[in-house]
Each structure stands twice: as structure tokens, then as C-alpha cells.
């Protein structure tokens, strides 16, 4: 094989030189290679003439001879020059002989072709003696690379129990050698570990070799794949690991963890409440576990049911009806666990462990008494005196068979109409009237009794419905109140009123009422219409109002009950004055007909009078308050506190907390005596101990004011009960365009003591206070 490679290399170089000679003509440089033959004839132009060839990774000493360029220019001053990216770095040329040399070992996998340009230039002038010629140096491949996998580890999965030949994964390895050279880049694969389960073809496809790959036996396989080229070259990096995971399928039956399950439950367990749990083992993965539990045999399928917990795959046994220890103390039956989604074609065999026996022991508990019926319905005719209505019966279901005591809940018999005996007999204590209550709903309690007759244990209740039957004990009466009227000049046969009757008793399907007048000697007659109504008409005509303004007619009404009852209802017929058209013009019963009596009219009049008096008082009070506000000062006249003056003078007597003398002393530096009336009145604010007054010559006025303010501030801070001095003050401000400008004391500076405020006395009584505050003090003038 190596000889063939060398021969192919020499042949390629020879053909390249021939092509160069053919294209260059007589004056173009010629490229020569080792073993080049003399050319006596022009070669065809389709030969590749501009190529040189060299083997990669040559073991000979550097530099390596690549080829030779020649020219028919025979000049002593000619030299050969190479140009290109790799000229002078990797390749060089002998300037005199034209030999092209490689100064580095070449690697075809890095660079497979080098592009160079050959020139013949003058040694002295470096001018081209011929046109430049480009040529290519191709690196011949040698089999110096082994195949390398794209990944060191491949991950794949395949369903368990797959058929033989099922594709798993395709692995890929790449050989960097020249694929055009036979055998250099051809990749071959083989499994060196795990080949008893899987196979691989020359394309790198791995497939199953056997069909019984069971995930429950081995869930994952580690396969080692090795690759080499066609010439058998392999290396360390030509090995890869393939991790093949078996995907689970539902091919296993659930198996009970026990062959027998025993549970003990109280007999009073609630229907539908879990009484036990069944556990199975299913080697399949959770998504393939769908266990279904069922009772195989026995007559208890209607007593118990088994549900599946989807999260834990457990069976939950629940009772479907109440358990009774006194009837059955133990239940035994067989159960089966199946999987409806199992893949039977992959199922090897059934182990028989998917069946088990269940035993349920019922425990006795103290149960409440049990009534023989769910409810009782008794009937009793009304007006009966303490008869036996009915009997309720309850028994102790336990083995103790204790005696039972009965009682009626007071909340169901608030009127205490009934009583019950120890034997459960129910009697009525009072006569029952169906027209008052037609039904009675009683709640009867049953308790177990100990040997002393005291209730013990649990209790049970039952509803007793007592229906009161009707008896014909109510005579018929008018269906509504009638107030008939008749004209005093009514003619004979004039209809006065049509009456009908009603009965409080249960009315039969076809009730029949009979009507009759008790006294036939009146001026009225009764005509029975035979439809449970009757007409009252004038018998003779002409009534005398002066003799009788009202006529009272007793009417007898009889029913068709057994026995028949007759009632008497009285009609009061008023005689009225009428006009010619027969319209009533005056009736004494009009006031009564309106439904308003004399007492009611008096009460209404008193209410109206009371409301009127209250309204007048409210209006008067608002008027007085409005007048009081009209005489009071507005909010703009408030200074330090609200002072209300009901008269022109004397208002300053209320300002005990506002010491006017202090302000005057500041202005004049003298002490103004307090009025005796101010000392007699109690102070509104906390009394402040003032500092001793200093003469104006010893201390300035404004300084004394500052001291006074500090003292008041300190005492106000220490007095938790007194009102604060730093409250909001509202001052009236007349404006800069007025004569007095601002009246606020805050706008007064310390140098206003020379201002004459006597003009305030001319402003009237409302400014008297300001005139006294800012007016000159005679004592100050004396001191000055």
C-alpha cells in the first residue's frame, strides 16, 4: 500500500510538470518535480500543470524537497522568487536552481493546500523577466488520524420488552483524514462491552439484540462502543460510552404485601368512613400503577366497597351500610387486585399473589335506643279529655337490654298539652281544639335507664306527629260583618242585604247552610236562595225613624253536620233618610260606620294640640338664640379667649386671666392697681405668680414683658390641668388702608409707647376695651 501511495505521488507530480510546460511556452518558467521526464511535445492544456504535491508528516530531515520551477530564460542575472502567504515561512525557493523546499512538517488536517506564486526577476533590478505564475502545493494525506466520537457519553432509552432489532440510538465518529483516499476516513464500529444485549452496524446505529429486556431486572445498560478506520487505525479517543435506559411498560401485576388482612372496627362506624387500608407492591413505575381492588366472593359486596387511592395506590375499605354487632360480629371475604391497563402480551406469568383474605371484626359499642319506627303519626278527635293518643316503643340494641325511659322535649310542647309515661304511652293533658292547632309535632326522647331508673348512656329521638280531627263543635255564622241600611220610605220587597255563612269546622265537600229569621213579626222577611246565601227584603214597607232608627234581626243559621248545629247572628239594620232617587242622605250610624268614636276624636285632637305646642316652643327657642348671637361678638373680635358681653360696660370683669395692668405697665413702666371686683371673682385660668415689678429706670418695659411671658409659659408647661396659652388666636385685621391699620397686639413693636391711642375713645362703646388697654394711665404720667 505504501508503494502504491508513492507511485501515485510521483505520477501526480509528473503530470503537473507536463501541464506547466505546455501552458508556459518557450519563455515561461517550468516546474520540475522529482523523477520528471523530458518533454519533447506540447501537452494538452487540460492537464493540471500548476500543482505540486508533498506528503504530510514526512519523517525525513528538514527541509523537504517539494518540486522545481524552471524557465527557458538563460540569463546569468536571473533568479527565482516565491510570493504568497506562506512564502518565506513554510516554503522557500533556491534562487539559482528553482528548487521549492518546505521548512516545516506539513499536516493536511490543518492545511490541505497552499497557494504560491513563482517569479523570475533580475538580480540587479528585481524586475520581472517573465510573467508571474501561480501554482498550488497539495499535501498528500497519510492515515495518521483515527476516528473520534462526537460525544464521550451518549444517552438513550428504549421501551422494555422491545422486539429484536428495535433502534436505540445512532452514534457518530469522524475521521479527520482525507475521505478521497481509500480507507483513510472510513469509520467502522463495534461494541466491546454489552454486545450480548445490543448490536451496532457500520452507520453507528445501535439496536436491540434480544427481546426480553426487563426493566424490573435491569433498568439501565452501559455499552462501550469502539471505532476504527478501514485500515484498522484506532486510538484512545475512539471509544464512547452509551447509557441505555429501559422505559417502563405496564407488564406486572400488583401483589399484596400480606396474604391475610384483619381489621377491627366499632359497630357505630359511619357509612363511607375508611375502616382499613390494603397495600400492594407493583414493580412498575408510578404512572403504570393503576390497581383496582374488588371483592371476589361472599355475600358482603353490598356491605363493603374498596376504593383506590390514586396517590399511594392503596385500597381503602369502606362500609356501605351500618354495621350491627348484635347481628354479625365478623365478616370474612376474599379480595383481588388487578390492573386494567396491564400489557398482557408482555406478561410472563401470574404469580397468584394478587389475591388475599380480609377479616373484619365488629366491636360492640354502647348504642342508643332504637325506635321501632322512624316517626309516629297519631290521630285524636278534638275536645277529648285525656285519652290514650298512641304509644312509642324503643329498645336497647345492645346485649344488656336495659329498660328504656321516655320524655317529651319541652321545646316541642311549650303549651304542655301532652305527657308520656314510662311505657311510652302519650296522653293529652288539655282538651285540644282543632280550630286553634290542627297539628302538634312532638320530639320524644328515649334514654337507657340503670337499675335505679336514672338515664345513662346515649339517647335517641323520634318525631311524633299528632293530627287533631275535627268535630262539628262550631255553629255557622255570618261570613262577614254586615251593616245594612234601608230608606224609611222603602217599598215592599225592597232588597236590604244578601247574607252568606261560614263554619270554622272542616267544611264538607257540599256544605248546606239553612237561614231563618228568629222573629217573623218584623217588617223584614228572609228568602233562602239555596246556594248558601239568603236575601233580606222589606216585608211591608214604610219605616218610622222617630219610632225606631235601628232594627235588630236575629238570623238562625244551621249546617248539615252530624249532629247539625245552629247559630244565631244578628243583623243591625239602620233606617236612613233618602231623597227621591232612593239615595241615603242621613244615617245616624255614619260616624260608627267611619270607625271613629268620640274618644278617638278627642285623642286625635290632643295629639294635634301637643304637636302644635312643641313646634311653637322650638321656633321660640331658635328665635331667642338668634337674638343672642346678634348681640355677641364675631369670631374676628376674639383675643386670647372668647368673651361675650351682654351689655356695653362691665365686660372686662370677665377677663380674669388677661391682666390688663401688665400691658399698661409695660407701656408706662408703672403698676396699675387691680379692681376690687376682679379680686372677688374666681379666676378662669390658673393664677400666675408674677415677678416683682421694676421701675422703668432700672429695667426696660419690654424686658419686663418678656419675663412675664417666660413665667406664664413655665407655669403653663407645669400645669397639666390648666388650658394652654399657646392656643390659636384670631385677630381682626381691618387692612392697611384703614385709619387704625392692624388692631392686633402682635403687630405692636416695642417702640410704640409714644403713640397716642386716645382716639380710640371716640370709636364708641365697642372699642372701650381697647381704649383702656392702650390709653394713657394717669399714674404713669405722675411717675414720669
UniProtKB/Swiss-Prot annotation:
GO cellular component, one term: cell junction
Protein name as annotated: Cadherin-5
Subunit structure as annotated in this protein's UniProt entry: Part of a complex composed of AMOTL2, MAGI1 and CDH5, within the complex AMOTL2 acts as a scaffold protein for the interaction of MAGI1 with CDH5. The complex is required for coupling actin fibers to cell junctions in endothelial cells. Within the complex AMOTL2 (via its N-terminus) interacts with CDH5. Interacts (via cadherin 5 domain) with PTPRB. Interacts with TRPC4. Interacts with KRIT1. Interacts with PARD3. Interacts with RTN4 (isoform B).
Effect on the protein of changing residue 774 to A: No effect on PARD3 binding
Domain note: Three calcium ions are usually bound at the interface of each cadherin domain and rigidify the connections, imparting a strong curvature to the full-length ectodomain.
Cell location: Cell junction, Adherens junction; Cell membrane; Cytoplasm
Occurrences of domain Cadherin (ranges): 46-149, 150-256, 257-371, 372-476, 477-593
Proregion positions: 25-45
Binding-site positions, Ca(2+) 2: 56, 109, 141-142, 144, 177
GO biological process: adherens junction organization; bicellular tight junction assembly; blood vessel maturation; cell migration involved in sprouting angiogenesis; cell-cell adhesion; cell-cell adhesion mediated by cadherin; endothelial cell morphogenesis; homophilic cell adhesion via plasma membrane adhesion molecules
Upper taxonomic lineage: Eukaryota, Metazoa, Chordata, Craniata, Vertebrata
Transmembrane segments: 600-620
Stretches the record annotates as Required for interaction with PALS1: 621-660
Gene3D superfamilies in alphabetical order: Cadherins, TCF3-CBD (Catenin binding domain)
Signal peptide feature range: 1-24
Outcome following mutation: residue 777 to A: Impairs PARD3 binding
Main location: other
Side of membrane Cytoplasmic, spans: 621-784
Residues of this chain annotated as glycosylated in UniProt: 59, 155, 441, 523, 535
Keyword set, alphabetical order: Calcium, Cell adhesion, Cell junction, Cell membrane, Cleavage on pair of basic residues, Cytoplasm, Glycoprotein, Membrane, Metal-binding, Phosphoprotein, Repeat, Signal, Transmembrane, Transmembrane helix
Single GO term (MF): signaling receptor complex adaptor activity
Repeat is among the record's keywords: yes
Amino acid at each position: 500500500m505504501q508503494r502504491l501511495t508513492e507511485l501515485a505521488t510521483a505520477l501526480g507530480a509528473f503530470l503537473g510538470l507536463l501541464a506547466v510546460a505546455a501552458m508556459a511556452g518557450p519563455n515561461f518558467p517550468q516546474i520540475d518535480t522529482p523523477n520528471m521526464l523530458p518533454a519533447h511535445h506540447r501537452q494538452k492544456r487540460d492537464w493540471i500543470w500548476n500543482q505540486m504535491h508533498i506528503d504530510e508528516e514526512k519523517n525525513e530531515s528538514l527541509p523537504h524537497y517539494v518540486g522545481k520551477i524552471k524557465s527557458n530564460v538563460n540569463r546569468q542575472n536571473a533568479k527565482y522568487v516565491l510570493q504568497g502567504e506562506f512564502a518565506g515561512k513554510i516554503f522557500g525557493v533556491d534562487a539559482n536552481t528553482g528548487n521549492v523546499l518546505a521548512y516545516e512538517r506539513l499536516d493536511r488536517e490543518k492545511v490541505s493546500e497552499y497557494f504560491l506564486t513563482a517569479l523570475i526577476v533580475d538580480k540587479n533590478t528585481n524586475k520581472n523577466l517573465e510573467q508571474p505564475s501561480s501554482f498550488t502545493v497539495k499535501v498528500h494525506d497519510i492515515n495518521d488520524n483515527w476516528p473520534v466520537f462526537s460525544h464521550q457519553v451518549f444517552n438513550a432509552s428504549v421501551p422494555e420488552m422491545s422486539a429484536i432489532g428495535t433502534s436505540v440510538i445512532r452514534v457518530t465518529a469522524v475521521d479527520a483524514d482525507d475521505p478521497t483516499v481509500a480507507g483513510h476516513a472510513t469509520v467502522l464500529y463495534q461494541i466491546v462491552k454489552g454486545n450480548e444485549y445490543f448490536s451496532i452496524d457500520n452507520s453507528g446505529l445501535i439496536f436491540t439484540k434480544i427481546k426480553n429486556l426487563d426493566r424490573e431486572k435491569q433498568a439501565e445498560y452501559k455499552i462501550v462502543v469502539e471505532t476504527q478506520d478501514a485500515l484498522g487505525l484506532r486510538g484512545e479517543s475512539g471509544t464512547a460510552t452509551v447509557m441505555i435506559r429501559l422505559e417502563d411498560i405496564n407488564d406486572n401485576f400488583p401483589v399484596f404485601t400480606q396474604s391475610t388482612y384483619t381489621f377491627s372496627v366499632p359497630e357505630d362506624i359511619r357509612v363511607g368512613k375508611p375502616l382499613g387500608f390494603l397495600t400492594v407492591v407493583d414493580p412498575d413505575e408510578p404512572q403504570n400503577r393503576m390497581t383496582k381492588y374488588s371483592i371476589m366472593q361472599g355475600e358482603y359486596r353490598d356491605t363493603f366497597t374498596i376504593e383506590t387511592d390514586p396517590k399511594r395506590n392503596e385500597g381503602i375499605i369502606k362500609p356501605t351500610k351500618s354495621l350491627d354487632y348484635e347481628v354479625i360480629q365478623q365478616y370474612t371475604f376474599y379480595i383481588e387486585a388487578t390492573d386494567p391497563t396491564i400489557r398482557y402480551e408482555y406478561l410472563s406469568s401470574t404469580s397468584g399473589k394478587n389475591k388475599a383474605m380480609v377479616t373484619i371484626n365488629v366491636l360492640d359499642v354502647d348504642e342508643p335506643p332504637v325506635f321501632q319506627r322512624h316517626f309516629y303519626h297519631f290521630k285524636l278527635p278534638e275536645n277529648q279529655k285525656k285519652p290514650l293518643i298512641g304509644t312509642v316503643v324503643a329498645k336497647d340494641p345492645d346485649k344488656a337490654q336495659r329498660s328504656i325511659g321516655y320524655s317529651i322535649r319541652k321545646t316541642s310542647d311549650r303549651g304542655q298539652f301532652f305527657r308520656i309515661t314510662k311505657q311510652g304511652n302519650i296522653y293529652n293533658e288539655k282538651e285540644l281544639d282543632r280550630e286553634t292547632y290542627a297539628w302538634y309535632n312532638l320530639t320524644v326522647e328515649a334514654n337507657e335507664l340503670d337499675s335505679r331508673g336514672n338515664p345513662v348512656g346515649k339517647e335517641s329521638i323520634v318525631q311524633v306527629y299528632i293530627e287533631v280531627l275535627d268535630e262539628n263543635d262550631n255553629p255557622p255564622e255570618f261570613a262577614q260583618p254586615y251593616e245594612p241600611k234601608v230608606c224609611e220610605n222603602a217599598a215592599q220587597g225592597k232588597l236590604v242585604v244578601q247574607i252568606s255563612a261560614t263554619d270554622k269546622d272542616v267544611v264538607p265537600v257540599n256544605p248546606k247552610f239553612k237561614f231563618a229569621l228568629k222573629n217573623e213579626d218584623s217588617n223584614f222577611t228572609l228568602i233562602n236562595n239555596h246556594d248558601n246565601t239568603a236575601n233580606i227584603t222589606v216585608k211591608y214597607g214604610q219605616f218610622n225613624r222617630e219610632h225606631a232608627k235601628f232594627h235588630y234581626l236575629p238570623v238562625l243559621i244551621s249546617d248539615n253536620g252530624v249532629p247539625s248545629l245552629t247559630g244565631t247572628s244578628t243583623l243591625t239594620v239602620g233606617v236612613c233618610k233618602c231623597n227621591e232617587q232612593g239615595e241615603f242622605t242621613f244615617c245616624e250610624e255614619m260616624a260608627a260606620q267611619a270607625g271613629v268614636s268620640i274618644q278617638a276624636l278627642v285623642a286625635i285632637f290632643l295629639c294635634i294640640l301637643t304637636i302644635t305646642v312643641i313646634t311653637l316652643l322650638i321656633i321660640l327657642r331658635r328665635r331667642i338664640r338668634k337674638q343672642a348671637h346678634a348681640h355677641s361678638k364675631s369670631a374676628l373680635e376674639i383675643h386670647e379667649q372668647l368673651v361675650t358681653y351682654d351689655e356695653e360696660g362691665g365686660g372686662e370683669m370677665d377677663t380674669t386671666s388677661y391682666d390688663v395692668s401688665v400691658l399698661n405697665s409695660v407701656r408706662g413702666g408703672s403698676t396699675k392697681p387691680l379692681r376690687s371686683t376682679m379680686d372677688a371673682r374666681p379666676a378662669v385660668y390658673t393664677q400666675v405668680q408674677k415677678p416683682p415689678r421694676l421701675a422703668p429706670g432700672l429695667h426696660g418695659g419690654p424686658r419686663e414683658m418678656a419675663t412675664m411671658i417666660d413665667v406664664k409659659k413655665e407655669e403653663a408647661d407645669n400645669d397639666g390641668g390648666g388650658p394652654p396659652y399657646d392656643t390659636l388666636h384670631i385677630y381682626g385685621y381691618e387692612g392697611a388702608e384703614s385709619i387704625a391699620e392692624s388692631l392686633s397686639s402682635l403687630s405692636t413693636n416695642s417702640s410704640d409707647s409714644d403713640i397716642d391711642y386716645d382716639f380710640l375713645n371716640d370709636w364708641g362703646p365697642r372699642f372701650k376695651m381697647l381704649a383702656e388697654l392702650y390709653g394713657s394711665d394717669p399714674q404713669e404720667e405722675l411717675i414720669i
